[in-house]
């Protein structure tokens, strides 16, 4: 689960909010994983754009979820991400996205809940309605 998905899910004013809720409902039995970097980026984005209370709701949702878990990006995955970023000039990939790509590749995760086109460009299957 990428930052853009978490933002859409938690922020009722986000243009993808309804789609995020429906996607989450459709994939309710799937194992849902996000990373500590994504959690931090989502916190920062939601806090700055929507305020403290919605950002705390994100943390509570992650903490209380039976379906979603937070995995930590290892130093090895971070190193893979940095090497990958050095070789990529075709798009403005973010550091957090690159760590997600590395985590997904090493964990053999091929599908992602996101509204960020960079995941498809990096070769992952974006789950949509």
Where are these regions (language model features)?
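Acidic, PIN/NYN-like endoribonuclease modules and their adjacent C-terminal/linker elements
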Residues: 101, 106-129
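A general alpha-helix detector
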Residues: 5-6, 41-42, 80
